[in-house]
Amino acid sequence: MASLDNLVARYQRCFNDQSLKNSTIELEIRFQQINFLLFKTVYEALVAQEIPSTISHSIRCIKKVHHENHCREKILPSENLYFKKQPLMFFKFSEPASLGCKVSLAIEQPIRKFILDSSVLVRLKNRTTFRVSELWKIELTIVKQLMGSEVSAKLAAFKTLLFDTPEQQTTKNMMTLINPDDEYLYEIEIEYTGKPESLTAADVIKIKNTVLTLISPNHLMLTAYHQAIEFIASHILSSEILLARIKSGKWGLKRLLPQVKSMTKADYMKFYPPVGYYVTDKADGIRGIAVIQDTQIYVVADQLYSLGTTGIEPLKPTILDGEFMPEKKEFYGFDVIMYEGNLLTQQGFETRIESLSKGIKVLQAFNIKAEMKPFISLTSADPNVLLKNFESIFKKKTRPYSIDGIILVEPGNSYLNTNTFKWKPTWDNTLDFLVRKCPESLNVPEYAPKKGFSLHLLFVGISGELFKKLALNWCPGYTKLFPVTQRNQNYFPVQFQPSDFPLAFLYYHPDTSSFSNIDGKVLEMRCLKREINYVRWEIVKIREDRQQDLKTGGYFGNDFKTAELTWLNYMDPFSFEELAKGPSGMYFAGAKTGIYRAQTALISFIKQEIIQKISHQSWVIDLGIGKGQDLGRYLDAGVRHLVGIDKDQTALAELVYRKFSHATTRQHKHATNIYVLHQDLAEPAKEISEKVHQIYGFPKEGASSIVSNLFIHYLMKNTQQVENLAVLCHKLLQPGGMVWFTTMLGEQVLELLHENRIELNEVWEARENEVVKFAIKRLFKEDILQETGQEIGVLLPFSNGDFYNEYLVNTAFLIKIFKHHGFSLVQKQSFKDWIPEFQNFSKSLYKILTEADKTWTSLFGFICLRKN
C-alpha cells in the first residue's frame, strides 16, 4: 500500500505519461463501510446545503477478462460505453472513524464492443452527484447487483424500482420515491476534478474529513480519540496482530485494558485468605487512562478529555490507569503503565504501586485534580483483622466519590496478567446490555406481549469460539437485528442466556418509563425479580460512556462470561461478612489427598464408562449434579443439552464457573449446552417437572436419559421420597428413555458391618499407613436392611475428616418402586466388576490400588432402568 503523498505524486505523473493520453485518469476517495443510515445522513446533509446536483441512471455490466474488469456502461436512456478499468495504486486510512476510507488511483481505457454472457455482474446505479466545488464532486449511489439467473429474472423489476418512478426524480424526492432498504448497496465516492498539479495530500484529507463530519460532527475528535488509544496500546501490547486490531478499530479501549472480574464465592475460595492482596474501594466512576504526552495532558475514557498542557517543554510520557469523574474532571489512579518514560507493565503490582503515587504527583503539579486510590496491603489471615481492613475501605465516609464495592488486586503479575476482582453488594451487582427492540410478527410463544410494556431483547458480546463451545444458538429474531457481516465476525452479540435462566434476555420495558428510545443503546441494569418466564429488570442508567465502544463494532455490553459470572451473585449472594470469614456453604470444600489417587481414578473410570453409554444424546438430566464433577465426562460424550439439578446454589455457581473453564482450557470434539436448575429434589415431582419443562427448548416428550451419580441416598429417607423420585423420572423421560444411577449399595454396606460386628454408633475403618482412609459409622439399630430410613455416617475423601450422613439405598426396594411406576430393570452391576477393565485402562494406577480401595469400591454399584 502506497503512502498518500506517493499516490498524489503518481497521479500527477500520469498526465505526463504519453502511453496514457487516451485514458481517463481518476483519483477517487471511497468509503467502504456505508450502510443505509450513513448514506441517508450524508445525502440529507448535502441536500440541506442546496449544493448544485444532478441525478443519473446507468446499468454497468462487468466481465472479468484476464484479471481485468471489462465494462459496458449503459448511460440511460441510450448511450453505451465500452472500457476497461485498471487500478494503479491505493491508500487506505487506518483510523476506524474513517469508515474504511480508501483513496484509489485508476485508469479507464476505451475498448471494442464485446459480447455479454451469463458470467457478467450487472450493477444498476441511481447516482446523485453534488458539485461541492470546482475541485471536487461527491457522488452518492444506490446500487443493485445481479448475477447469473437473477439478471433475467429481476432486471426489469429493479430497473422500474430504481429508475422508472411514478414522479420525476429530484434530489429532494429521490429517497422517498425509491424507498431504499437492505436490498441495495450504498456507495459514497469523492472524485477530484481540479488541475492535477494543484492537488496535495492535505487536500485529500480535508475533503475526506468534510464528508465524515457530515456523518459525525465530532469526526476530528473521534480521530484524535482513536490516536490516543493507539498511543496507549503501543505501550501495552507487543503483538502486531493485537495492535492491528486497535488500529483497525476492531478493538476499543475496553478490549485493550485488563478487565476487573466480578468475584463469585468460587473465585474467592481459590485464594482465601487473601494475604498479600491489595484492597481498595470501587468508585462509581468510569474507567479512564490519564496520559501526559509531550506537552498535552488528557484522559481517554468514553471520549477524549483534555486536561491542559505542561507548557512549552515536552515531558517524557506518563500513563496512569484509574477511574474518572467527567463532571468534575477528577482522576483517581489505581495502576500505572508508564512513569516518565519508564515502562512498568512487566512489574508486579506491589512494585508498580510505588510509581503510581509519583505519577499522581506529576498530574497534581499541573493543577490536575488527581488522587491515588487508598490501598491496604492485606498481611493477616485473621478474620477479625480482615474485617477491619475491609470496613476501613468500604465504609469510609470521607471519600470524595460514592463507593459501590471493593476491589482486590493480586500481586506478582504483569499489568495485563494481574487478576483484579470486584465485590459488590447484591443490590449493586449490575450488568451492561446492548438492548434491541424485539422485531414484530415473530410468532414465538416465549415472546408473548404484555399490555403496557414493549418487549426488548438483551445482548452481550461473545467470541465465535466460545459461542461454539457452549453450543449456543441465536435467539428468534436475531437475524432481523444484526447484519450478516456482524454475525460473521470473531466477536459478536449474543442474547444473554445464563445456564440457570435461559430466558433472562427478555426485558419488558414499561411504556411509562422515563428512559425512552432505548433500542440500540447500552444499558446498565439490575435484576429485581425472576418471574416464571422472564426477569424483571430495572434500568440503572444508560451507559453513554460506552457509546463510542459500541461504534467500534467490537463491543456489545458485558462479555458473555463476565455477564454470567456477575449473574451468579444473584443466584448465590456473596455477603460482606464472607469477605472476612470466607465463603459459607462451599460444597465439599476440602481437597482429596494423594492416598485416594488410585481409588478416585477407578471411580472416575467407571463413571466415564457409564456416561459414554449415553454419548451424543440430545437431552440429558443430571439429578444432584453438585458442582459439576462429571461435566467433563458429559462434554467428552458429546451430550448436546445437559440439565443439572441441585439444591445447593453455591455448587451450581461452581458448575457454571467450570462450564467456562472447560470451554477455555479443554478441547472437546462436541459442544454441550448447559442448563442448571436450583431445586430441592425432595419437593413434589409435579412441581419439579413443570420447572424443567419450562426450560427454553426442552422437548415436550422429555429427555433421552436421566443420570444420578452418588446422590440418590439423600432421597431414601422414606417411601414417599422414593415414590416421588420414580414419578419425577417418569415425567421427565421420553418413552424408552433410560435412568442411570450409581450409588452405595445398602445390602453390601450392611454385609460389611455384619462381617466386622459393627454395632450402633460404632465405626468401621479402613486404614493405610496408620491413616484412616475410609470409614462408616452405623447410626441404625436394625439387623436387616429396611426399605428406607436407615442412616449411616460416611467419611469422604473430600470431607476433611468429618462424617457426612446419608441413607442406605435398598436397591431391591428402589427397583420395585420404579417398576410400579412404569420402568423395567435393564442392568444392575457392582463396581467391583469394573476392576479388571480398569487394569487394562491403566496398569500403573491399578498397581497402586490397595485392598482397602477394592473393598470400598465393592460397596458401590450401578442400576439402569428403562421407561416402558
UniProtKB/Swiss-Prot annotation:
Induction: Expressed in the early phase of the viral replicative cycle. Its EC number is 3.6.1.74, 2.7.7.50, 2.1.1.56. InterPro entries: CYTH-like_dom_sf, mRNA_G-N7_MeTrfase_dom, RG7MT1, SAM-dependent_MTases_sf. It holds the Pfam family mRNA_G-N7_MeTrfase. Coiled coil: none annotated. S-adenosyl-L-methionine binds at K607, G624, D646, L710, F711, I712. PANTHER family: MRNA CAP GUANINE-N7 METHYLTRANSFERASE, MRNA GUANINE-7- METHYLTRANSFERASE. This is mRNA-capping enzyme.
